[in-house]
Amino acid sequence: MPSQTAPGRRSTARGSGSRRSARRGRTDTGGSPAPDRAPDRDRAARRARSGGADGPVPVRVHPRPGLLGGRLRLQQLVLIEVAAALVAVGWTISRPVAAGFGAVSLVLLVLAVVPLRGRTIPEALRVRAALKARRKRARTHLPPPGTDPALAPALELEPALRTCTHATEADFGGRPVRRETGMVGDGTFLSAVLLVQAKDLPLRPARTARPLPLDVLCSALRVDDITLESVQLVQHTQPAPAPHLPEQSLAARAYRELADGTATPALRLTWVALKLDPERAATAVRARGGGEPGARKALQRVTDQLAGRLNSAGFNVTVLDERELIAALAISSCVNPLATAGRQGSGGGSGSGRRTQETNRFWRVDDRWHSTYWISRWPQLGRPGGAPGRIAVPDLVNLVTGAPALASTFSLTAGHGTGGSVALSGHVRVTGRSESEAVALGRQVEARAQSTGLGLARLDLEQAPGVLATLPLGGAS
């Protein structure tokens, strides 16, 4: 595998239009269940668990770099100031000159203020140019021969992605045991993935009885001398009964008899992806040998630490190896298993043709249509054992992923916000069997979100970056 910190690969990947576009979809919020404001994150997590669960979680929007107030971008302010300066200068010269400068100022004000489908005109032009660049690249790029068919759709989204295995040996009772951890990166980051499951119990507890502790996830942003880029939580849900079953089928009738049958998933997988930027954690990487080996060791340290904490919190945690990681990417992409199996042995390369396509409103893989939304507004969230908010986090996730879709995906990425807060960025993706079904599912999800106060913005012209943000790769950055 090429070096994850090679300067050439870093510059190539950072120039990708899709990654730049994904960065624009990021939102900083300071309302995570346990924002880490102290250097000692273990202490902060303990304080949050003991004394921070008395009331609902207030979600506050923090301005990100280049954003003033909450709505006005720095570039918009510059355009407004330039327009005002032109009018003032023209007025001091003469009225005819002021009239000419006023016309130019009017154009600048239109560019700065007038929205186009929720974006300023310069931003809309940049987004459209990035989409054209991705489409042009898609016409010429195919995964190389020998690519695993399960990984090929992800490579069509981000050609620089590579997977690898980091092997370690542990001594158990005088007997060395080899452990393998799968990692994925594109030259600018390296990620490992955990599969988190509830422990087997004779009676399954209620959905809200043991939610995944977000304070523990946020505490993994800094472990020892290692600072992660982000921690991503991904929940992939397939509904029950299957949407294609007739209403009078035995399975459909059985689920209707359940008290909460419409919210009962057939499959719900939870992954936690840990994303390391070797440049951000340069000191920790150098302390462990530098280069790709040092980055792998640093990521392995954080992965083991978080797995241990989640196990102590009452969950079964599995660190995915390389094959399991590729399978997780395929499941999250909702690829057609028949299409993947049909390419086994063919190499999945240039002879198999391209399997994905991005349109203005959808991303298609095989015969599945995906529509991705960015969470633009959060409701007041409640905590278990405390004063209720408008809705609890498990109920919110269950509501937006409970549509009768082929699959639904919820992604929550925690990163470093302003003033030592935790930045949260959320995305929702629904998958249908056709374009018309995806449209209907999108409307249903939008209506469900609106009923709770959750704001969803469909990522028109940015569906490919949106899908990348919902795959267990560590989140958009």
Predicted regions and their residues:
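Membrane-proximal, solvent-exposed terminal domains/tails of membrane-associated proteins
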Residues: 2-3, 254-477
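N-terminal topogenic membrane-targeting module
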Residues: 111-213, 222, 449
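Short loop/turn segments at secondary-structure transitions that flank enzyme active sites
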Residues: 200, 237-239, 276-280
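A short acidic (Asp/Glu
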Residues: 205, 239-248, 283-284, 329-333
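Short secondary-structure junctions
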Residues: 222-228, 402-405
